[in-house]
From Swiss-Prot:
This is DNA-directed RNA polymerase subunit beta''. The keyword Transferase applies. GO terms for molecular function: DNA binding; DNA-directed RNA polymerase activity; zinc ion binding. Keywords: Chloroplast, DNA-directed RNA polymerase, Metal-binding, Nucleotidyltransferase, Plastid, Transcription, Transferase, Zinc. GO terms for biological process: DNA-templated transcription.
Length: 1387
């Protein structure tokens, strides 16, 4: 007893409350000290004590014990405020849907987390002995998150797919949920309505499909004799020890394992825990194990490839149905895992980014060249730095340096004042393996119907050549311009008669787009591309639509300025002031000159031609060169044709270069070869040396001509030129040599001291070269001479009859040289250089009454006669002044001007001179025919103007009366109207007041305004274009009121005075986001596109912006009509998945059905290419494909197994790899026969088993081409050997009908077929014995059984000498002896 007391005195006496972790520590110390049995007695006593105490204290839980957190109210309010601001930003188009979702989730997540942290201190301060507090924080019952849901807020929930619902549940269970909140919380909750109904069935269906794929796989042999294996390396840092042990235990080695010279494990030995520990301690070579992948049996599996049976730890028995076991082991945890769904929301966790905060107040400075602007994932503007960035913060007395790691976002600007603890940067969290990132697609649908516009160029996605999917190269807005549409099959018949003028889709006027910050994107314009070249696969084809429209209408392809097809003839039909050129592609009348060259029509962007401007040009193939060189035209007189007014026209076009007109008909081209090399490249020839043809210049370039080499080093590159020609070392007498760089005509004598005089045959170019330390010499270079023909005669361009008309429009043909004198021309490789361009110059006479016509308007017109479509360019001559009487004189009138029955004779679109007396009172909307969605009914877009609202200077009452009166009378202002998409230009001289806009409400006045300083005095105001929005067509019928859709508030007016100083310059076609300040009076209220600019107001067509970031795909064409609910954009974004199986199960299914967005196939393809390259290097060509193919299949199988394992492991569920392997083996075991190199056995596109394909190939001794495919589990179950099992799975009628027609035979090898037909299933460990016994019953006499006894002994002896016999004894020998032996025993 004393001893005990003494011992006890050593132990420390504790007196404190004990929680779960302390309890764990205590127990482990007890076990170490006293051993297991003793500890369990102690714990029993503790348990009894606890229960007695609990009964004595009688802890109970009442609803009043749930204390809510006082700060909750304002926290929630704050979060709501933030999400409101966010919603606004989204509405204005500053943030797109994905960013909004992300941010709102993070706002609520943060709020919820904060509340959760507040909870504990709150309990501790108010009532530490609160039963809820005691229970949850001692770990007895309930965890923090559950208590948080009781007293804090339930927070964010996920839906059955594991997607976040971005509507948080703000109340807690103490306060009670509203109906909506209850329904939302049903989704995530375990015993919720949704869970039991939806999830369990999902998991069950998964199991069913899995079992379906592998039901026929049974262990049938002991050893298939394969030599292949999969190697597992113990030293691999990626694999943790636990996973390694799990992978190895129960497997069979495929190869002997040596430790130095000693063999520590033999082939075909199964691995136990002892062996694994030895492998791990020795960390030996990679261990090669056998897996179901490597098994050579076709439709079943052998014992050694399967390994130990999971039930009794011995090698698996013959006849075990391992397939079904595998399917169920994978599917069953799924049903379990749906149970573990209680969670606080699988969220984008807040911990994805660390913040860098400012150490003190001060000014921040950093090097702006190292960063570039970008958006954070919440859509905030930020700077991204690629390399380490040093930021200095200067406060009054001290300078802090902060280092910001690469790939981080800077959230402040240079020289900004920051406060202490302000977040200045966000560090990208390292992608840890724990939070899985997955790529998700999010579609964004349009809220209203309208017309689609976008404000940058887009790429056509190369994968979708034939559809309208575009990729965005940079962040920009998509706009849906509102406009109701009306579908009808009757009305259009009265609209478009034969030969009516219709316009091709719509040529947009010059538009300048505006982004949120009112920065005009002038950089949107680029060089134009032809939209046809589909060069190398995968290159992006530019599809310009925003600024320079591409118009495709079947056979003709205009780019604006348009490029026509080859073989176009130009035809002109001209009447009076108009001039129409049809384009015909007629092959019969091929002119030898015009045949192959392209005529391009060049129209300035705003569609106005001035005198002597170029209408069309074509590049004569005779003046094309493939190589670089210099043009010279010596002393020839030249004048550049760039006049002042042209420059004004062209100020929008980037690609403007002067053209030079020739007086004399000859110029020269001196060829030279130019290589432009990077500065670092090594050059293999010396400066001023002479080389031959095909000499190596650099490592990978060779010269195409021989001659003299000149090397010039520029800043970062080297220009290497090669001149071909002769070298002359001149004597003293030689006069020529003093001149450098002159042209010598043929026929002149050339003096040389040694040789007699020679006459020159051709022109030559002489250049003097003085190398260092050497005598200078003269280099004579050959010259290509070009004669310029004196323009092509117009008669060859246009049919004769057209030219004979007396006409006031003239066309001249002029040749221009495109390069200046002496200017070196650089040709990029494989392009041709056009030296001369033949242009068609437009000119016209004075008008008859002496008023001069300054400009002409061009527009495209498409006329359809029967089924021939002709496209015309139409020129409208515009007089500067128009008399403003009530009648309107319309010299450029068009066939579709509605004239309310007064005079219907002007249907001829080519010539009409209409006088129209009535006002446009009837026509309150504009129509435009569309590309139909469905052929039967024609769709029209309506811009209704019956309910325009105007923010203007008039008061409403007067405004209404005046408008109604004036609509009855004639309009006070002459308005002329033209159908050309580019419109005509009247001068409007007098503003009565701004209400006149409503009279002409179906037109759009587009102004090219000049800001006049003394605007108040002058009444003679701007030039206006008067045009129908995008060239609308009016409806000539009085009954047209059906068409209008007056409920869309499409246009509205905005008071805006030009005389004010404004923050933004307003231009036509410009888009405004909501809340942009236009005038001083404050921000303006709606978003839209400016249609009309007046002196004191604007008309804006309302539009809704959608922001899209780079990489998003845009659906639909520019200008297409979208209806409500159509898909606009698809974003692909990464989000971190919660580790919840609610997302796990769909993930497993995605992998097994092979349909993930992360596209397994893509990564595999890249991997294949990588493999093939490397293997070629190692093995050389013929082997690489063979081995490459084998390896890829193996590689893809392993990566599939890993993907599935990852999901289950994240849930803490252990499934042995071999189960997954069996299934993956089935979905990868089929190959698709491809067309090339067809053998006569399989038809192309047929799915056959991999082994069968290989065997057939060997038997036929010819190659069968096939490629591996990944079938999903559903497809694999419908592509099995047995049609009975397929029919019992899905699509019964179809499968059976097909099988009957093909005459398929079912060999009843699997389990399911036999079950369906009521036979005995061919599995079970006693199965083989059973078969044998039935035989023996019939006719086997007794002597054999004695033999069997002997055989049994013989087998034991064999066992020792196994290696000796292995070669000569057939493989199945042991099997037979064993079977017959069991037979004898049973007897």
């Amino acid at each position: 007893m004393e001893v005990l007391m003494a011992e006890r005195a050593d132990l420390v006496f504790h007196n404190k409350a004990i929680d779960g972790t302390a309890m764990k520590r205590l127990i482990s110390r007890l076990i170490d000290h006293f051993g297991m049995a003793y500890t369990s007695h102690i714990l029993d006593q503790v348990k009894t004590l606890g229960f007695q105490q609990a009964t004595a204290t009688s802890i109970s839980l009442g609803i009043d014990d749930l204390l809510t957190i006082p700060s909750k109210g304002w926290l929630v309010q704050d979060a709501e405020q933030q999400s409101l601001i966010l919603e606004k930003h989204h509405h204005y188009g500053n943030v797109h849907a994905v960013e909004k979702l992300r941010q709102s989730i993070e706002i609520w997540y943060a709020t919820s987390e904060y509340l959760r942290q507040e909870m504990n201190p709150n309990f501790r301060m108010t009532n530490p002995s609160n039963p809820v507090h005691i229970m949850s924080f001692s770990g007895a019952r309930g965890n923090a998150s559950q208590v948080h849901q009781l007293v804090g807020m339930r927070g964010l929930m996920s839906d059955p797919q594991g997607q976040m619902i971005d509507l948080p549940i703000q109340s807690n269970l103490r306060e009670g949920l509203s109906l909506t909140e209850y329904i939302i919380s049903c989704y995530g909750a375990r015993k919720g309505v949704v869970d039991t109904a939806v999830r369990t069935s999902d998991a069950g269906y998964l199991t069913r499909r899995l079992v379906e794929v592998v039901q026929h796989i049974v262990v049938r042999r002991t050893d298939c004799g394969t030599l292949q294996g999969i190697s597992v390396s113990p030293r691999n840092g990626m694999i943790t020890e636990r996973i390694l042990i799990q992978t190895l235990i129960g497997r069979v080695l495929a190869d002997d394992i040596y430790m130095g010279p000693r063999c520590i494990a033999a082939r075909n030995q199964d691995i136990g825990i002892g062996l694994v520990n030895r492998f791990i301690t020795f960390g030996a070579q990679p261990i090669s194990i056998r897996t179901p992948f490597t098994c050579r049996s076709i439709s079943w599996i052998c014992r050694l490839c399967y390994g130990r049976s999971p039930t009794h730890g011995d090698l698996v028995e013959l006849g075990e149905a391992v397939g079904i076991i595998a399917g169920q082991s994978i599917g069953e945890p799924g049903t379990q895992l749906t149970l573990r769904t209680f969670h606080t929301g699988g969220v984008f966790t807040g911990g994805t980014a660390e913040h860098v905060r400012a150490p003190s107040n001060g000014k921040i400075k950093f090097n702006e060249d190292l960063v570039h602007p970008t958006r954070t994932r919440h859509g905030h503007p930020a700077f991204l730095c690629y390399i380490d960035l040093y930021v200095t913060i200067e406060s009054q007395d001290i300078i802090h340096n902060v280092n910001i790691p690469p790939k981080s976002f800077l959230l402040v600007q240079n020289d900004q004042y920051v406060e202490s603890e302000q977040v200045i940067a966000e560090i990208r969290a390292g992608t840890s393996t724990l939070n899985f990132k997955e790529r998700v697609r999010k579609h964004i649908y349009s809220d209203s119907e309208g017309e689609m516009h976008w404000s940058t160029n887009v790429y056509h996605a190369p994968e979708y050549t034939y559809s309208h999917v575009h990729l965005l190269p940079k962040t920009s807005h998509l706009w849906i311009l509102s406009g109701g549409s009306y579908r009808s099959s009757i009305v259009p018949l009265s609209l478009h008669k034969d030969q009516d003028q219709m316009n091709v889709h719509s040529l947009s006027v010059e538009r300048r787009y505006i982004s949120n910050f009112s920065v005009t994107n002038d950089q949107v314009r680029h060089k134009l591309f032809n939209s046809y070249p589909s060069s190398k696969k995968g290159e992006r084809i530019l599809d310009y639509s925003g600024t320079d429209r591409i118009i495709c209408n079947g056979h003709c392809n205009f780019i604006y300025p348009s490029i026509l097809h080859e073989n176009s003839d130009l035809l002109a039909k001209r009447r009076r002031n108009r001039f129409i050129i049809p384009f015909q592609s007629n092959q019969e009348r091929e002119k030898e000159l015009m045949s192959r060259s392209d005529i391009s029509i060049e129209i300035p962007i705003n569609g106005i031609f001035r005198r002597n401007s170029i209408l069309a040009y074509f590049d004569d193939p005779r003046y094309r060169r493939n190589n670089s060189g210099i043009t010279k035209y010596g002393t020839i007189e030249v004048h550049a044709i760039v006049k002042k007014e042209d420059l004004i026209e062209y100020r929008r076009a980037k690609e403007f270069r002067p053209k030079y007109q020739m007086k004399v008909d000859r110029f020269f081209f001196i060829p030279e070869e130019v290589h432009i090399l990077p500065g670092s490249s090594s050059i293999m020839v010396r400066n001023n040396s002479i080389i031959g043809v095909d000499t190596r210049i650099t490592l990978n370039a060779r010269s195409r001509v021989g001659g003299l080499v000149r090397v010039e080093r520029k800043k970062k590159r080297i220009e290497l030129k090669i001149f071909s020609g002769d070298i002359h070392f001149p004597g003293e007498t030689d006069k020529i040599s003093r001149h450098s760089g002159i042209l010598i005509p043929p026929g002149t004598g050339k003096k040389n001291s040694k040789k007699s005089k020679k006459k020159l045959q051709n022109w030559i170019y002489v250049q003097r070269i003085t190398p260092i330390k050497k005598k200078y010499f003269v280099f004579v270079r050959p010259v290509v001479t070009y004669e310029i023909a004196d323009g092509i005669n117009l008669a060859t361009l246009f049919p004769q009859d057209l030219l004979q008309e007396r006409d006031n429009v003239q066309l001249r043909v002029v040749n221009y040289i495109l390069y200046a004198n002496g200017k070196p021309i650089r040709g990029i490789s494989h392009t041709t250089i056009q030296l001369v361009r033949t242009c068609l110059v437009l000119n016209w006479d004075q008008g008859k009454n002496g008023s001069s016509i300054k400009e002409v308007h061009a527009s495209f017109v498409e006329v359809r006669a029967n089924d021939l479509i002709q496209d015309f360019i139409r020129m409208d001559l515009v007089k500067s002044t128009i008399s403003h009487t009530g009648k309107r004189n319309d010299p450029a009138g068009s066939g579709l001007i509605p004239d309310n029955g007064s005079d219907r004779t002007n249907i001829n679109p080519f010539y009409s001179k209409a006088r129209i007396q009535q006002s446009l009172s009837r026509h309150q909307g504009t129509l435009r025919s569309l590309l139909n969605r469905n052929k039967e009914c024609q769709s029209l877009i309506i811009l209704s103007s019956s309910n325009c609202s105007q923010m203007g200077p008039l008061n409403t009452l007067k405004y209404h009366n005046v408008t109604k009166e004036s609509i009855k009378r004639d309009p006070p202002i002459p308005i002329r109207n033209s159908l050309g998409p580019l419109g005509t230009v009247p001068k409007i001289t007098n503003f009565y007041s701004s209400y006149y806009q409503l009279i002409t409400h179906n037109q759009i006045l587009v102004s090219k305004y000049l800001l006049l300083a003394n605007l108040k005095q002058t009444l003679q105001v701007f030039k206006y274009y008067l045009m129908d929005e995008n060239g609308k067509i009016y409806n000539p019928d009085p009954c047209s009121n059906i068409i209008f859709n007056p409920f869309n508030l499409n246009w509205y007016f905005l008071h805006h005075d030009y005389c004010e100083e404004t923050s933004t310059i307003i231009s036509l076609g410009q888009f405004f986001c909501e809340n942009v300040c236009i005038s001083k009076k404050g921000p303006h209220l709606k978003s839209g596109q400016v249609l009309i600019v007046h002196v004191d107001s604007l008309v804006i067509r309302s539009a809704k912006p959608y922001l899209a970031t780079p990489g998003a795909t845009v659906h639909g064409h520019y200008g297409e009509i979208l209806y409500k609910g159509d898909t606009l954009v698809t974003f692909i974004y990464e989000k971190s998945r919660s580790g919840d199986i609610t997302q796990g199960l769909p993930k497993v299914e995605q992998v097994l059905e092979v349909r993930s967005i992360d596209s397994i196939s893509m990564t595999l393809e890249n991997r294949v290419e990588g493999w093939n390259e490397r293997i070629t290097r190692i093995l050389g060509i013929p082997w690489e494909y063979l081995i490459g193919a084998e390896l890829t299949i193996a590689q893809s199988r392993i990566s599939l197994v890993n993907k599935i394992q990852k999901v289950y492991r994240s849930q803490g569920v252990q499934i042995h790899n071999r189960h997954i392997e069996i299934i993956v083996r089935q979905i990868t075991s089929k190959v698709l026969v491809s067309e090339d190199g067809m053998s006569n056995v399989f038809s192309p596109g047929e799915l056959i088993g991999l082994f069968r394909a290989e065997r057939t190939g060997r038997a036929l001794e010819e190659a069968i081409c096939y490629r591996a495919v990944l079938l999903g589990i559903t497809r694999a179950s419908l592509n099995t050997q047995s049609f009975i099992s397929e029919a019992s799975f899905q699509e019964t009628a179809r499968v059976l009908a097909k099988a009957a027609l093909r005459g398929r035979i079912d060999w009843l090898k699997g389990l399911k077929e036999n079950v369906v037909l009521g036979g005995m299933i061919p599995v079970g460990t006693g199965f083989k014995g059973l078969v044998h016994r039935s035989r023996e019953h019939n006719n086997i006499p007794l002597e054999i059984k004695k033999k069997n006894l002997f055989e049994g002994e013989m087998r034991d002896t064999l066992f020792h000498h196994r290696e000796l016999f292995d070669s000569c004894i057939p493989k199945n020998f042991h099997d037979t002896s064993k079977q017959s032996f069991t037979g004898f025993n049973d007897f």
